[in-house]
Amino acid sequence: MNDSEFHQLADQLMLYIEETLDGFTGDSDIDYETNGGVMTLTFENGSKIVINRQEPLHQVWLATKAGGYHFNYRDGHWYCSRSGEEFLAKLSEAASAQAGENVSFG
């Protein structure tokens, strides 16, 4: 994958997350802000999730209250470099824990 392909895939992922949050109908208020390729989700309890791209490594990084994770793209999905867990599943798990209700990204 070249840098251009990486940016296109990372942009698609960020847009999908934004669209999912815009359509969220739960009780929790989840705000998001994207600045310089870094997306920050802020929850009512003040906790945050940070998603950012690491261009030199062609990875997307996810930072949650539970820990930090690095994801590589293969076979149409982003997978954790340690656990093999898919990005949207991990994001759903973390967002649900931090929101105190089910938040699904896929």
From Swiss-Prot:
The keyword ATP-binding does not apply. One of its GO terms (cellular component) is cytosol. CDD domains: Frataxin. InterPro entries: CyaY, Frataxin/CyaY, Frataxin/CyaY_sf, Frataxin_CS. GO terms for molecular function: ferric iron binding; ferrous iron binding. Pfam families: Frataxin_Cyay (PF01491). This is Iron-sulfur cluster assembly protein CyaY. The gene is cyaY.
